[in-house]
């Protein structure tokens, strides 16, 4: 199957998962998976959230951002990492994360897949 994101409807989700500004995405859903091409404008973010019953994989296409992640042990320290085009991010089931566009002038564009486990 080929998914042509640019031919699908663009969804605009304000304050997605408690984040800042808007998250824009072209999305594909079936019974088991959510796959999307996402876009965060400068200063926009996806809020910190936990993956229960799923994991998430993100491949950064362009821009730069900040990933905040925490293991399933909620007493553990949150880790912060800079992400750049070409980076692949993985959030296992039970872990939490957020993604912020830290650029002042470039969108953060990425593919993401959330398979049901």
What are these regions (language model features)?
Residues 37, 80-82, 96:
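Well-ordered beta-strand positions in beta-sheet-rich domains
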Residues 84-85, 93-117:
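Ligand-binding loop in jelly-roll beta-barrel domains
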Residues 34-52:
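Conserved short histidine dyad/triad with adjacent acidic residue
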Residues 42, 53-54, 64, 95-96:
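A generic "binding-loop/recognition-motif" signal
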Residues 1-34, 47, 80-81:
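A short, N-terminal "cap"/entry segment at the start of jelly-roll beta-barrel domains
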Residues 37, 50, 61, 69-71, ...:
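Residue-level recognition of conserved beta-strand positions in structured domain cores
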Residues 55-85:
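A short beta-strand-loop-beta hairpin characteristic of the jelly-roll/cupin
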């Amino acid at each position: 199957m080929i998914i042509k994101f640019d031919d699908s409807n663009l969804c605009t989700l304000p304050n997605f998962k408690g984040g800042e500004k808007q998250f824009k995405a072209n999305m594909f859903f079936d019974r088991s998976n959510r796959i999307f091409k996402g876009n965060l404008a400068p200063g926009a973010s996806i809020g910190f959230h936990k993956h229960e019953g799923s994991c998430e994989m993100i491949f950064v296409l362009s821009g730069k951002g900040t990933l905040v992640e925490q293991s399933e042990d909620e007493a553990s320290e949150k880790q912060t990492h800079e992400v750049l085009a070409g980076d692949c991010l993985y959030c296992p089931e039970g872990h939490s994360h957020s993604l912020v566009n830290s650029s002042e002038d470039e969108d953060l564009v990425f593919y993401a897949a959330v398979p049901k486990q």
